[in-house]
């Protein structure tokens, strides 16, 4: 396999070094962290390739389809669900060498970047020109443009700027059979279905994204932040709903339950539930929005506390150390689970999830963010310690079984922005319903050999005859 790839791609692109294979056997999914710490390697690629051009990606996929070799795309490995793990061995296509900014269009407010571009680098380069992506996931300093598209990501400022599906204007993709596809480069079109949306969230199962054109925005001239205390979860959720209902567009609206508020505010004695609220843009408009938003919060029993806690959160918003440090301990247990629902169901879903998950962790923290006129996401963080890493791995499985059962019973989206990966595979067929068969037909048409991230999204794998020299015991 390696010699075939080297003949196809030339020197310096293909690796079968043990350290490279090991590095591409784990992402930052907590279960994968526990595997690593126990010396387990359920998934291992046979080779890693680092293409430098769309032509090289095309050659790899055409060859893999012809030879029936599994291919798994890899951005920067920051997935928390197992999405980039090579569950059937084969070739990992690491996109990190394709990291150029191809164009910045200041007239039409667009940037075109290759899929391996690190998010925070792109944001800084745009900031130097006076622009922002408006897309700011917690993983901005460790995730790639292609990874955002593959997982259907959302940033912390999505309530103003939109999620990744709202920000992508066009993309280039190589199908599993090696064809290059470029979606129309227009602000909008009515020429049939919007094909780019088919690939946003596909987690590499329908091909590999090689570059993306995104919207950009002028840096705001003015920003206001506030921390608001509410007595009850119901009060803060009601304020969020009304803020969105009347048409305000805060860039930041995060509401924490009492358990997470103590962490978010940084005060173990904090009583109540905290909201971080932020508006930005043209000064006059931002000030008007701020006044209305605070008035709404007060009408729902909220008490403004000043901007300090919200400002401190802005400074540390990419910090993932609480979860990472706990997972690094033998027996340390940490997990994040995000779902979404309509306003009339979100509180029942929240209470049911908190109750179902309480037996499995010392702390179950909850917050609401990524807010829409119709509903909101709900993000849960579980923290605890058990006897050892094997027990932690088993406990994580129980946590997901409990969380997904509750989400499905309540009709919630089983993921808002982390994606499916490996961890949600047992639940996706039920979540998609009759749409699963349609997606399977699309997969069969684009990937007749079944080689592109096989098994992900619960799609037919077409594993008969797939070549793989390695790969560990299957987890899926």
Annotate each predicted stretch with a short phrase.
Residues 1-62, 79-109, 258-267, 309-335, ...:
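N-terminal flexible segment immediately upstream of the FAD-binding catalytic core
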Residues 5, 64, 116, 178, ...:
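Residue-level signal for inorganic ion chemistry
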Residues 10-14, 408-419, 433, 444-454:
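Alpha-helix capping/hinge segments and adjacent helical runs
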Residues 15-34, 218, 224, 229, ...:
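C-terminal substrate-recognition/cap domain of FAD-linked oxidoreductases
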Residues 64, 204, 447:
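Conserved, mostly hydrophobic/aromatic
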Residues 100-254, 469-476:
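FAD-binding subdomain of flavoenzyme oxidoreductases
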Residues 179, 424-476:
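Activity-critical C-terminal alpha-helical subdomain
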